[in-house]
Amino acid sequence: MSLSRVSVTAVRNLHPVTFSPSPRINLLYGANGSGKTSVLEAIHLLGLARSFRSARLLPVIQYEQLACTVFGQVELAQGGHSSLGISRDRQGEFQIRIDGQNARSAAQLAEILPLQLINPDSFRLLEGAPKIRRQFLDWGVFHVEPRFMSTWQRLQKALRQRNSWLRHGTLDAASQAAWDRELCQASAEIDEYRRAYIKALKPVFERTLGELLQLEGLTLSYYRGWDKDRELSEVLATALHRDQQMGHTQAGPQRADLRLRLGGHNAADILSRGQQKLVVCALRIAQGHLVSQARRGQCIYLVDDLPSELDEQHRRALCRLLEDLRCQVFITCVDHELLREGWQTETPVALFHVEQGRITQTHDHRE
């Protein structure tokens, strides 16, 4: 799948624009502060209903504008196309439209437009809190396991009920036992989906990383959020008094983590920033392969400031892997000459110059 048309209005410093990207490689170049990253942010907003630059969306809306909007036409893997639109106003109201109809949730956008982001903050996947790695893991499971979303919703509902009971004790024992059974059942299913996903991801990740970097002894493992040798029901019963003191459930899928270790140490403590970037790239490219293998289409990659922290050899290796995915890629850089060469002659490459919020196409992929 790919975006064949994108329209952006009132997103940060961008002037209103409609452009037609290449179905494969798109290079957006220009000086720092010109608006290149804002273009990626607009696409990210269209696919996930959130920004990767700010936890709050108010700063995304252009000064003195009432709302920001992004529209896109998606060419679907199975043929045909889908029209997506999202608008967010200063009062925090969202409107999501899919093929002219109001959509209920951002998950519907994500299913149609699977996005992968690689940017200068990507190292946080290794250095950041477990929540970031759970989001990475669950993004992958969501796109390959059709049962994941409904099970996840069951889990969240049961977890909210238990946490409320821990804080306020508002349920009778029989009702709480029923919610605990639901929590344990949904947790077991989520753990099963995650475990199967990691089993599929590991060999693809290792192969992909080998194309980018030689790191002997790097291991990827999955911690499910509670003792692997005990049932969750037993763990919850044992920890009940402490959970009541804390006011929340301390064991379960909401505590899961991915662990990358090198020589017995946390990999993030040993690897350079450039090496961390390549490890994260390998993880995200491996996810793209699994989406394709599941016949769910292809990911769209948003790569912000690709040349940073990478030498020419590693830049070329990363570009080759992205090209081999045969998916749509948007790459920002200051100097497009660093990335313009090296693509296969049959790969459509489009160039867009971004200057003071204006986007001008300087090379059409059809030429």
Swiss-Prot record:
One Pfam family of this chain: SMC_N
SUPFAM superfamilies found in the cross-reference section: P-loop containing nucleoside triphosphate hydrolases
Record-linked Gene3D superfamilies: P-loop containing nucleotide triphosphate hydrolases, RecF/RecN/SMC, N-terminal domain
Functional note: The RecF protein is involved in DNA metabolism; it is required for DNA replication and normal SOS inducibility. RecF binds preferentially to single-stranded, linear DNA. It also seems to bind ATP.
Molecular function per GO: ATP binding; single-stranded DNA binding
Residues noted as binding ATP in the record, renumbered to the chain: G30, A31, N32, G33, S34, G35, K36, T37
Database matches in InterPro entries: DNA-binding_RecF (IPR001238), DNA-binding_RecF_CS (IPR018078), P-loop_NTPase (IPR027417), RecF/RecN/SMC_N (IPR003395), RecF_2 (IPR042174)
Keyword DNA-binding appears in the UniProt entry: yes
An annotated GO cellular component: cytoplasm
Keyword Chaperone: no
Name of the protein: DNA replication and repair protein RecF
UniProt-listed GO biological process terms: DNA replication; DNA synthesis involved in DNA repair; double-strand break repair; SOS response
Localisation: Cytoplasm
Keywords of this entry: ATP-binding, Cytoplasm, DNA damage, DNA repair, DNA replication, DNA-binding, Nucleotide-binding, SOS response
Family that this chain belongs to: Belongs to the RecF family.
